[in-house]
Amino acid sequence: MSRYDPAATESRWQAAWDEAGVFTARHDPSRPKYYVLEMFPYPSGRIHMGHVRNYTMGDVVARQKAAAGYSVLHPMGWDAFGMPAENAAMERGGHPKDWTYGNIADMRAQMKPLGLSIDWSREFATCDPEYYGQQQAMFIDMLEAGLIYRKNAVVNWDPVDMTVLANEQVIDGKGWRSNAPVERRELTQWFFRISDYAGELLEALDRLKDWPEKVRLMQANWIGQSRGLQFAFSTVNAPEGFDRLEVYTTRPDTLLGASFAAISPDHPLAKHLERHDAGVAEFVAECRRVGTSEEALEKAEKKGFDTGIRVRHPFDTALELPVYIANFILMDYGTGAIFGCPAHDQRDFEFASKYGLPIPPVFVAEGTEEAPLTEAFVPMKSERVAYVRGFAGAEIQTGEEAVAAAIDFCESKGVGRGVTNYRLRDWGISRQRYWGCPIPVIHCETCGVVPEAKENLPVRLPDDVTFDVPGNPLDRHPTWRDCTCPKCGAKARRETDTMDTFVDSSWYYARFTAPRATTPTDPEEAEYWMNVDQYIGGIEHAILHLLYSRFFARAMQKTGHLPAKAIEPFNALFTQGMVTHEAYYSEEAKQEPVWQGMLEPGESPDTQMTVRHITYHFPEEVERTEDGAILKTTGQKLKVIPSTKMSKSKKNVVDPMNIISQFGADTARWFVMSDSPPERDVEWTASGAEAAFKHLGRVWRLADEIARAEGAPTAEDVALDRATAKAIAEVTQGIEGFAFNKAIAKLYEFTNTLSRSGAGAEAKRRAMRTMAQLMSPMVPHLAEEVWSMLGGEGLVAQAPWPKADPALLVDDMVTLPIQINGKRRAEVTVPKDMAASEVEKLVLADEAVQRALSGGAPKKLIVVPGRIVNVVI
């Protein structure tokens, strides 16, 4: 008997698929189409088990849909621009282009052995000039359509690397790479008008029925719709031109609890004061050393500077509130100015307590009296409270009712107007980096900002750049930077900022429909292939990537690059769980000198401190024991961290190439699909991989045995046909419902049924061929081997998906338990319509019943049709 040897067979079938062009996507109007797409990877150079799981999921769907008669598009590309390539060039020498394309080649070589049903003819990288040139063409179209504009904006500036940092790249107020204190600097930036679509993007979430509820909620919260009041305080002692201070509040019902007003350090009033007051200038400079994100401001100590300016309360002009510049107010939300109600906002409470400001409560819990507060009272808006300083609505009402009543009251009195605001800000895309898509505009002293002529696209990145000096190499590349104005022909300068890499990934799904087109999309191909029917990726992309893609589809539709039906580009979204693994580490305590800044007064500079040094170890260096783990080389006992996300830092990574080399691609695919529901994390274990390999070997041996079997039909043929029909129905349901683990569980069960069946040889071969078809999406190489062994025609990858005979799904057999003197002793399976007298004969012939009777006859034998048989001795 031959043995299961994936190393000898898997590459052969991959070559056969390539030769037959099995996975080439074909525009075929006579067939329904299905577009399945996994979020394309960043070319880091190595694939990991998370990639294996993600792309196997998409592959299972793509293969099953192709077998079911769909024309399938299942492409692959590379999200290839970005900082890591540029940082690699700085740290190791070389060029980002070489580093990126080298990594792409490495990852492609690692992915192909997985046997994915990808149409590699459509492959592209976002750093290909053919791709980013079309992106530049769309930029110009969107600029002319008013979807893009330029303005000054406050950004995180790294003074060492001389670049803008994203909020997440600012760690404890310092640049993630340079460790230099970050500055808030105002720069001219390019923006997409995504905020114009905030209401539409929010409202349309309700129509995305096949998206996870969690993702829709995360996007809704990010868009952040709020209903509030915008009004103006009149000012006292303010500079000329600042006689009013516009504020926006979502809690106008708390106006009578206001004890101060606060403005952003970037507010026009703060900027005016900064130019004329050294104290203000010093405070604003301190504020600018904090990142620009809400998270950074939330973590920072709340500080304020009393400007000496006062504002009059709109309902009591005798009451004047101090105006502070506060480090926690964002200029780009609302008006950049707020009033503080410390009794009902914890941040305002801490601020008022710090600066000795009044804390008058506006409402109290229902049934309680007004009392001094030790912390802010912040009930849910839906909770009923008693208003002690209310001015609109009932005395006892919910916060929601009170806000609506307050807006109506204020509007009736001419104090402001009700406004719907959104947390979503316009999307700033300017990056002071080399390795990105150049922004295709030219700055001319005569004509101003001029788009590059489309016939000159792509504006290619120059190759002759160096990274030995901080900052953007494009700024110091005169032969690239200096150009002529396409409008007047005068000397001009190119825009040296490049686009945020999120732009690259916001439309790649559309480019896959016609990746070689000389326009961003081909109308005919986009009409046929769009939308993406099934999108697969991690929950970490729930907000930015998916939200930007939804906006971009609208912008592309407005500029004629996508059909109206593609305004929501992804019909269904699935967010898969992670692949996890135990982590192993050893620790050692060492005595080291105390850092000088930590020494107590009078303490010796030679003072030592105990420092724990932790060393992580790769799984292949570790041997598991009954009570833990040891290091193979030394026997040292190790600490074990329960299964956690695979990461290079913890060294708990499993190299897919090692798994493929040891067990084959099908084992890796089977295991990551079988052990857990796909939306949950799956723990990778060596024992689990070995068990998967053993099962696939068992399937191989079973197929080999059945292929060589001989024998006439038997009475069990029909039962096996029924089991086959059920397997078809349940595996199909599992795949279509993204319950891959349930589909695989059914295949385990079907294997057991087939191995135990006493059916005839031809019935078994028929069932085994069906098994090959059913397991083909999960383990395509083994499926081809089994299909070939059993005489299947052509490739199983091209065979139509099996259909269950409805008649065989109707179970006309019933299993009746046999009770002897009230205790269950046996069972008998009979046709549902079998006569009771015939059932009695089968029961009396049962071995367990015969042993109990010891040659005698039962006192009673009662058959309850379809339910039970009672034997009384």
Curated annotation (Swiss-Prot):
Record's keyword terms, sorted: Aminoacyl-tRNA synthetase, ATP-binding, Cytoplasm, Ligase, Nucleotide-binding, Protein biosynthesis
Record-given protein name: Leucine--tRNA ligase
Major place of residence: cytoplasm
Gene Ontology MF terms in the entry: aminoacyl-tRNA deacylase activity; ATP binding; leucine-tRNA ligase activity
Family stated for the protein in its record: Belongs to the class-I aminoacyl-tRNA synthetase family.
Protein localization: Cytoplasm
GO cellular component, one term: cytosol
Gene (UniProt): leuS
Coiled-coil region: none
Originating species: Cereibacter sphaeroides (strain ATCC 17025 / ATH 2.4.3) (Rhodobacter sphaeroides)
